Design a protein with these regions (language model features):
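Membrane-integral, polyisoprenol-dependent glycosyltransferases
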Residues: 2-382, 476, 558, 563-566
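Membrane-embedded architecture of ER/inner-membrane glycosylation machinery
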Residues: 2-5, 176, 292-303, 317, ...
Length: 574
């Protein structure tokens, strides 16, 4: 493999501290978005409302959403939301975002330390950038969910296991920390956190036919610690929520979602398709890596010896690919393959499926690449696995700019640009220009130097720069993200009703009082208005107001205020 980059310890501050460089750059690019964006109604606003209710009622282990038991998630993330609320006096999107961003940095840092020992600064930065800009991983860094935190604990668990198994960097505390990390993954998100690390370890030990390892790594000590911590948690839930809440937690939410999901039910093959676009823009490279890793190994240079005496420390102990282009699979490569395959198979067997559930496998998908690269050497398809997406982004960028500048008119896009005028603002255009230029430069390096790392690094950097530039119009986008903007127009002291809104029940997190939602039944709203003698604020979608006579009649009684796709009016009874 050609190496035109500086080695660790040489060069400037960026090459001496490649991971810190990537993390600081990522933080700077994402900071404005995290600081200014609104909360989404589906999950984020619900978490805030649940936290408010828990603080008001003094609940710590059993949570409720408007009086109804909410046993969908364990308490750790709600504790974080509650703590931030107490510390800042309000719900801070920036503060809560840190509990997605920092775990992402920890995950990437661990994978780099685990896999990239002795590698060039450019390779390390490229792999870190790839991890952080896989589309679903990047999205999970920005949204307020517990998935990234759970992923961090899963990575910590598997890293701890591998240290114990290989003896490389093993610590006396590892036998205790392995079950602790597994429990914390469970305590963050639920059953996937409990199942993924032991399943990956079990499949790996089975492949290696290390039957004694089951007792050593997944024996009574491991399960005893997990069971003890889980019993303590369940006991606290029982005391606070009672048997009905326990049944909801253990039966409905756990077994129900796995066997016969009441939400997010998808076919078995769903993840086989979803993982391709979730790993974009590195899908081709990583899919090719996975296939190359599965292909039979031929002409191994070094005979592997049986038993634990064999070196098991992964790519840092293998010979240079140029000297030995077809070595046998390292234990680390086998572990990563077992983790990816077993996790996707496990998730596919569950009835409830969402693309974001795949997040824990993404670090292993990305860092499988340098392991395979060391074993088989750099190939042309690896460079073009990155280059094809660079070309796609370049073509899209060059095609979009004339449209956004108004030089080219496309009738099909006129309505969209009219509905979303912020798409024509300078920060959006600048972001597209930055992304396009970065990929043009990446293509040049691909053709001129025939390397994969610089184009990959530029592709990721271009995405971050585009997000940074576009963040200047987040305040204009916020009305389309959440309800904060329209709720800021709600007057004090009125009752609030909603109709034709998606998940409006948690608007109380903004206005400090409960609302009445009339779903898709404006006739019930009309009856309620007629029967009430109190001032009433009505919130709905502007598109519905324009087409439904009942709403038009109600809104004609007051001043109509607009924000993004929503509008409201206040009806005062005289």
């Amino acid at each position: 493999m050609k190496n035109n980059t500086l080695q660790p310890g040489k060069g400037n501050i960026f090459t001496r501290h490649p991971m810190m460089t990537v993390f600081v750059f990522t933080f700077v690019c994402l900071f404005p978005v995290m600081l200014t964006r609104d909360f989404t109604p589906s999950n984020e606003l619900r978490y805030l409302s649940i936290a408010n209710e828990a603080l008001a009622d003094g609940h710590i282990f059993a949570f409720y959403n408007h009086g109804l038991a909410y046993a969908d998630k364990p308490p750790l993330y709600f504790w974080i939301v509650m703590l931030c609320r107490l510390l800042f006096g309000h719900h801070s999107c920036l503060a809560l975002s840190m509990f997605s961003l920092i775990p992402a940095f920890v995950i990437t840092g661990i994978m780099d330390k685990w896999v990239m020992k002795g590698k060039s600064a450019m390779d390390r930065m490229a792999l870190a950038g790839m991890t952080l800009t896989c589309v679903m991983f990047l999205g999970t860094m920005i949204v307020l969910r517990m998935d990234m935190l759970m992923c961090m604990f899963i990575v910590l668990a598997l890293w701890t296991f591998y240290r114990m198994y290989s003896g490389d960097g093993a610590r006396r505390s590892d036998s205790v920390m392995l079950p602790v990390w597994i429990f914390l993954a469970l305590f963050t998100k639920g059953p996937v956190g409990l199942l993924m690390p032991p399943l990956s370890i079990a499949v790996f030990l089975t492949v290696k036919r290390d039957w004694k390892g089951f007792g050593k790594y997944l024996g009574l000590k491991t399960w005893g610690i997990i069971a003890g911590l889980a019993a303590l948690w369940i006991g606290c839930v029982w005391i606070e929520g009672g048997p009905e809440y326990i049944n909801n937690l253990l039966v409905k939410q756990t077994v129900g979602r796995a066997v016969n999901a009441f939400t997010h039910a998808k076919p078995f093959w769903f993840y086989l398709v979803a993982i391709i676009w979730c790993l974009a823009p590195y899908s081709l490279l990583l899919a090719g890596t996975f296939v190359a890793s599965l292909l039979p190994v031929r002409n191994t240079c070094v005979e592997e010896t049986s038993g634990q005496a064999q070196s098991k420390v992964g790519i840092s102990d293998t010979s240079d690919a140029s000297n030995c282009p077809k070595q046998g699979r390292s234990y680390l490569e086998i572990l990563f393959l077992c983790t990816i395959i077993s996790t996707v198979a496990m998730l596919s067997s569950f009835s409830s499926k969402l693309p974001i559930y795949l997040v824990p496998v993404f670090p292993f998908c990305v860092y499988l690449f340098p392991i395979v690269l060391d074993r088989i050497g750099e190939r042309g398809w690896m460079r073009w696995g990155v280059g094809i997406f660079s070309i796609i982004f370049t073509v899209i960028g060059l095609a979009a700019l004339p449209v956004l500048f108004g030089a080219v008119k496309i009738p099909a896009l006129n309505d969209l640009l009219t509905e979303y005028p912020f798409a024509l603002e300078a920060p959006i255009i600048n972001g597209i220009i930055l992304l396009t230029l970065a990929n043009i430069l990446g293509i040049w390096f691909l053709l001129k130097r025939k390397v994969w790392n610089i184009p990959a690094l530029l592709l990721g950097a271009g995405l971050f720069l585009a997000v940074f530039s576009a963040s200047a119009v987040v305040k204009d986008i916020n009305p389309y993200i959440g309800y904060g903007s329209i709720c800021s127009k709600v007057p004090e002291g009125t009752d609030v009703a909603t109709v034709f809104l998606h998940r409006p029940e948690n608007i109380d997190a903004y206005i400090g009082r409960q609302i009445t939602d009339y779903g898709k039944e404006p006739e019930r709203l009309v009856e309620a208005v007629s029967a009430s003698d109190k001032p009433l604020t009505i919130i709905t979608r502007t598109s519905r107001l324009e087409t439904i006579p009942e709403l038009q009649k109600l809104f004609s009684n007051g001043t109509v205020l607009y924000s993004g796709p929503y509008c409201l009016t206040t009806i005062s009874k005289k």
